Amino acid sequence: MDGGQPVPSPLVPLGNGSDYSMSLEQKTTFVFVILLFIFLGILIVRCFRILLDPYRSMPTSTWADGLEGLEKGQFDHALA
């Protein structure tokens, strides 16, 4: 096609590979993406733990705590 010469690519540095170093913006972006992947992993693990055992994360109080002074079993009179 073009005489057998390689086509330059923006992803592959030309010349020696040891001359290529990441810029500050690329390093910052790389660290930010890694932190996002770590955060995503933590959220995935937390969601799977909630799906496997949903009642473990609930408080131990009962529904009757909100009746304010009424004993358990007397809710029929409170509704009337």
Swiss-Prot record:
Subcellular location: Membrane
InterPro entries: Cortexin
Claim: Isomerase is one of the keywords in the record: no
Keywords: Membrane, Transmembrane, Transmembrane helix
Key word Lipoprotein present: no
Transmembrane region(s): 28-48
Pfam families, per database record: Cortexin
Membrane topology: Single-pass membrane protein
GO terms for cellular component: membrane
Family: Belongs to the cortexin family.
Protein name as annotated: Cortexin-3
Organism: Mus musculus (Mouse)
